[in-house]
Amino acid sequence: MWMHKKILLKLSGESLKGESSYGIDPRTIKKIAWEIKEIKDLGVKIAIIVGAGNLWRGRTGEELGMDRSQADYMGMLGTIMNSLALQDALEQTNTITRVMTAFPVSSVAEPYIRRKAIRHLEKDRVVILGAGAGSPYFSTDTAAALRAAELNIDVILMAKNNIEGVYNKDPKKHQDAVLIKHMKHQQILSQRLAVMDITAASLCLENNIDILVFNMLKKGNIKKVVLKEGNIGTVISSKGE
């Protein structure tokens, strides 16, 4: 079977809130867990990074006049909360998981150690990576690119909410926006497209890591992108094809 065999799934925090305005929606996180289990049962090695936008937004810190580092650490703690929630949802599907965090939270998770994370993947455990990159000023997109490089991941699957992929302009503001099916990493940098931040895009370019941006809210899309079916989303690669 032709498929991606080792993936990093990047979930936004918003993907966990479903139709709610805040927090974690039980039905949504269970649905995501079952879709992850489905690809896990195909033999795919899976690492996951979750954002925290459902619990904390950087702009809230700005509105409060908070120090940027303080606000970023709050976001990192939010990703740990989401990681634990996703771990529980996955384990309800009888999927073996490990949560590893970029800074120690020893009561609830393992510290991130590269060689240990690789070993967990080799043992077919789903590895959920919390606390982003562990330092302020680095987004969870950058953390995803960093961990993908460290763990020799084939592709980063960037799951979006009701957005089919990368467009030539904002589809929420422009009805004539066109979906781009294939592009190069360099286009993100040169055109400053809002796919991921520049640091993350640069890391992917330097380490030749492919990115696939897709709409995760359509049932079965995670499996389809893993199996390379249906020509879904936008593929970003060094070749642009």
UniProtKB/Swiss-Prot annotation:
Gene Ontology CC: cytoplasm
Binding, ATP: K10, L11, S12, G13, G53, R57, N161, Y167, D170
Catalytic reaction list: UMP + ATP = UDP + ADP
Record-given protein name: Uridylate kinase
Summary of the function given for this chain in its UniProt record: Catalyzes the reversible phosphorylation of UMP to UDP.
Subunit comment: Homohexamer.
Keywords associated with the record: ATP-binding, Cytoplasm, Kinase, Nucleotide-binding, Pyrimidine biosynthesis, Transferase
UniProt source species: Onion yellows phytoplasma (strain OY-M)
Molecular function in Gene Ontology: ATP binding; UMP kinase activity
Main location: cytoplasm
Source organism superkingdom: Bacteria
Statement: the UniProt record of this protein carries the keyword Cell cycle: no
EC number: 2.7.4.22
Location of this chain's protein in the cell: Cytoplasm
The family this protein is said to belong to: Belongs to the UMP kinase family.
Activation/inhibition comment: Inhibited by UTP.
Keyword flag DNA repair: no
